[in-house]
Amino acid sequence: MCCTSGCALTIRLLGRTEIRRLAKELDFRPRKSLGQNFVHDANTVRRVVAASGVSRSDLVLEVGPGLGSLTLALLDRGATVTAVEIDPLLASRLQQTVAEHSHSEVHRLTVVNRDVLALRREDLAAAPTAVVANLPYNVAVPALLHLLVEFPSIRVVTVMVQAEVAERLAAEPGSKEYGVPSVKLRFFGRVRRCGMVSPTVFWPIPRVYSGLVRIDRYETSPWPTDDAFRRRVFELVDIAFAQRRKTSRNAFVQWAGSGSESANRLLAASIDPARRGETLSIDDFVRLLRRSGGSDEATSTGRDARAPDISGHASAS
């Protein structure tokens, strides 16, 4: 289950009236290309913050704060927040909004006007421990992978995305929704669904439901996390899902050099060559690379190559 413990909110949260007033004051019109749909329901932002489990000890990286609904709830939780906003108009107004609704809490907010995909470690004064984000479908996967790679300090990610994207992120091996994002996120941690969000809590109202997804980074990674190893694992994932309906033996022929060598490598990794790539877990891909000479059996984490399966299959809550 998702973490739901929290404290009583004391900061004034934004409602429908405040959201509309702010937009009118700024002469702001939401841009569909940026996925600008803003939450105006206090119970929803409370729920997102509770699902994230953030506390006073956290430095939260909020992606896409918009008009500030979720920002205020995160600050009221006691967290320090760095808000990354791509829209310069919204970024310039956020601190004023927080000051008006929280009095003395604005000192715990830093605003960065930047595309999240261009964000680097040196852009932040301190390493974030958590991410909370409301992401449009077209940037959700690249943004999540970029943040998990760029900021190894992040221990938990809580993201609100379109329901269809949420299903893909947390899908089980072999399911229709299971794909490249499902596997790659599990390289970093356990992935789970945390429920649905109605379109009626947003302005403008989107046409689809949203879903909450939480990613908990492994406390101790069962495999190396350096860029070189990750890229080689991800290469295998991309190969398998480029031809997801093929048998693993046939999908990996070019990578292995021949059909027989492909079968031998799969068997060495305890994978049936007749299995389709869409059924393989992150553990399978890592094991395939290792048993094919892709890395030493002794890893940088001190874990054996035959580490138990902790791929973090999704669970609904």
From Swiss-Prot:
It comes from the Bacteria. GO terms for molecular function: 16S rRNA (adenine(1518)-N(6)/adenine(1519)-N(6))-dimethyltransferase activity; RNA binding; rRNA (adenine-N6,N6-)-dimethyltransferase activity. It is found in: Cytoplasm. GO terms for biological process: rRNA methylation. Its EC number is 2.1.1.182. It holds the Pfam family RrnaAD. Keywords: Cytoplasm, Methyltransferase, RNA-binding, rRNA processing, S-adenosyl-L-methionine, Transferase. Specifically dimethylates two adjacent adenosines (A1518 and A1519) in the loop of a conserved hairpin near the 3'-end of 16S rRNA in the 30S particle. May play a critical role in biogenesis of 30S subunits. PANTHER family: DIMETHYLADENOSINE TRANSFERASE, DIMETHYLADENOSINE TRANSFERASE-RELATED. HAMAP family: 16SrRNA_methyltr_A. This is Ribosomal RNA small subunit methyltransferase A.
